[in-house]
Amino acid sequence: MPPTRKISIRLTEKYYTKLELLVESGEFTSVSEAVREAVKLLLEKYKEQLESIAQMDTYR
């Protein structure tokens, strides 16, 4: 398993309740797992922008 980093976030009660519903329905085993999946989807959405930024950093 690759190294991990622990973070802390604040969510509205509404968002947290929706995440709990996903866990209770069996879609995820924990709220943390649901948040990790959300981050993964976000990073995939911005993959091209992130690659461009990484390339710009190479030229600095």
From Swiss-Prot:
InterPro entries reported in the protein's UniProt record: Arc_rbn_hlx_hlx, CopG, Ribbon_hlx_hlx
Name of the protein: Uncharacterized protein AF_0569
Gene3D superfamilies cross-referenced by the UniProt entry: Met repressor-like
CDD domains referenced in this protein's UniProt entry, alphabetically: RHH_NikR_HicB-like
Pfam families: RHH_1 (PF01402)
GO annotation terms (biological process): regulation of DNA-templated transcription
Native source organism of the sequence: Archaeoglobus fulgidus (strain ATCC 49558 / DSM 4304 / JCM 9628 / NBRC 100126 / VC-16)
